[in-house]
Amino acid sequence: MGVEPFAHDPAPSELIHSVPACGSPERRVMRPMVREGWLADRQHSDRRGRGRERFLPVSWDAALDLVAGEIRRVSADHGNAAIFAGSYGWTSCGRFHHASTLLKRMLNLVGGFTGHVDTYSIAAGPVILRHTLGDDRACGGQANTLDSIAEHSQTLVVFGAMSPRTAQSEAGGIGAHHLETYLRRIVERGVRVILVSPLKDDLPDWVAAEWWPIRPNTDTALMLGLAGEIVRSGRQDSDFLARCTSGSELYLAYLRGEGDGRPKDAEWASTITGLPAEAIRALAGDLPRTRSMLTVSWSLQRAHHGEQPFWAALGLAAVIGQIGRPGGGVGYGYGSLGGVGAPFTIGKSPAMSQLSKPINSFIPVARISDMLLNPGGPYSYEGEDRRYPDIRLVYWSGGNPFHHHQDLNRLSEAWTRPETIIVQDPMFTATAKRADIVLPASTSIERNDLAGNKRSDFILAMGQAIAPLGEARSDFDIFNALSGKLGVAAAFNEGRDEMGWIRHLYEESRNHAQRHHHFEMPDFETFWAQGHAPCPVQRDHTYLAAFREDPGAHPLDTESGLIVLGSATLARLGYADCGPHPAWIEPAEWLGKAQAGELHLISHQPKGRLHSQLETAEASLAGKREGRDEVMLHPDDASVRGIADGQTVRLWNARGACLATAQVTDSVAAGVAILPTGAWFTPAEAEGPELSGNPNVLTLDIGSSAFGQGCSAHTCLVRIEAHAGDAGDAVRIYDAHLAAILPT
């Protein structure tokens, strides 16, 4: 089996060369299995045996009977809200064999489930933008397109990142990677680019950006300081503020320091961010004079008070007054996924329906440990007072919370609370190891599917390349068989098999393009034979252009119909951690109140794998030493700790500890450590550190605020020291532990 790039992709990802590794038996779930203790005692088993007890093989029919029996038992005894349908995962970009969607489709047919809202990638940001911009399209790829920015912007301020590293992938797949093309056009035009980030590599070096190595979690203060300087010098666009915003008087009063006596100026911002006041003041003078675009990566809102940088960026853009003009304004998430900012589909993307929901039970996605540890406990979300459901059954398909959740030691404790945990996955992830029932799903190269989404200009055929390994079945086949056990197969499959559904989903997109956009896509046979079909797309898009021209005729879906800079809704709610205007609120952990020796840990996306996927492929292994991921340290921070490049180090705080390999580089700001996510959770057998370099044993598991409840992974202080002794190879240790609990 070989791999070659898509012919229409100008900058294909190197990750495609890791795809054949999916066909390897290494760490694959090869047959249905049940934890020994659970098989003996079912819901009364010792739940601390998860991850420790041996698995026993069972037939597919027996496994499906057990799963169907648990769904029926929990539904009858505790109600369907006691079933948690996992969150989501990147197990496949296929839109038909989309494991999470198919699980929820099946469960909706038998009474429903508790689900989730928002994502680990982005939660606080969309919540605040829904109330201040009326929707979250600006962070989902429908702000100014990159082609418009490349042709019209004169000053580009990148808060966080705009990196091809994080733009390699896209939910639903991506046909063409456009980011590098537009970045090179930006360079060609001589656009001034400023990168505000603790990591210099968050833009390619050939962009030659000015690097502003900001303290993590302080971007809000910089945005407020820039806006305050513009207002202080009288260069704000008063006409735009009057016509297109509401509550601006509250926001402007805060910038002037009328409430707290401290104007938000360059000196104030400098003391918080660590950036020179002179540079802040100079940039504040330049932004209104040039066509200026602000971009904010999703990473900024994965922090305590993560709503604030998204709202503060909107406030700064409103003060500058270029929202709705080509190459001006603000946008979110460029580079966070491959399709954000690219020409976006205006047609219908292929997608399976979850069907209607019999119950509306959900949690904010990153509050899973809170839910499991505090059944019935109160919490707030988006202005509503809610209570956590009492979860008895967890069914997780195609996801790995022991990768993407925070404070994994706390999650490990929470994981002992449900009566039964079912995991359906191709791989024996750390989550699958901690299941009661494990069902082997096929990978995307072992079945037919199609890919496509709102941020891609193609629908792609995904033809089966190899036979499924072992006894693996496709997600559709698993849920179809399970639906039969539950008596809802006809409603689940609607009389279609795999290829019948793929044809149906494609034809829906094709007919929509023809009917609504007079765009001709090839018939299904041609599409399947050539492997792709173009979609109708919007190019050279300027976000909010019509609104700027006539706000009355094109109102936003906000409390005022305008951009909200002072919110009556948030004023009424009275949250201390998310007030009525953009504001600097100290995070729970940051360098401004660090103890001696503490560093700020950032856990960003890895280069050599997709989150925790493709962990065993060569590209991922090449970024490890002794099976451990590398943590980036500034030379000064390494020197004072006696740490050499390539040395094993221990990172720790009150929440946990892990080992990693030191990578000493001046590309990271002093006081900051950067350890990528996705290493497979490998706790030591005895009390000791996690061995693979998984940063989520260290990260903070609190909501961004009572309003947004997003994850706060980037609010994290740690200590680092050289590790003495031989810790062994983490990859081999994981494999040895897995072998010990699998059937012989």
From Swiss-Prot:
GO terms for biological process: anaerobic respiration. It comes from the Bacteria. Its cofactor is Mo-bis(molybdopterin guanine dinucleotide). GO terms for molecular function: electron transfer activity; molybdenum ion binding; molybdopterin cofactor binding; oxidoreductase activity. Its EC number is 1.-.-.-. InterPro entries: Asp_de-COase-like_dom_sf, BisC, MoPterin_dinucl-bd_dom, Mopterin_OxRdtase, Mopterin_OxRdtase_prok_CS, Prok_Mopterin_Oxidored. Binds 1 molybdenum-bis(molybdopterin guanine dinucleotide) (Mo-bis-MGD) cofactor per subunit. One of its GO terms (cellular component) is outer membrane-bounded periplasmic space. Keywords: Metal-binding, Molybdenum, Oxidoreductase. SUPFAM superfamilies: ADC-like, Formate dehydrogenase/DMSO reductase, domains 1-3. Mo-bis(molybdopterin guanine dinucleotide) binds at S121. It is an enzyme of class 1 (oxidoreductase). This enzyme may serve as a scavenger, allowing the cell to utilize biotin sulfoxide as a biotin source. It reduces a spontaneous oxidation product of biotin, D-biotin D-sulfoxide (BSO or BDS), back to biotin. Belongs to the prokaryotic molybdopterin-containing oxidoreductase family. This is Biotin sulfoxide reductase. It comes from Cereibacter sphaeroides. The lineage of its organism: Bacteria, Pseudomonadati, Pseudomonadota, Alphaproteobacteria, Rhodobacterales.
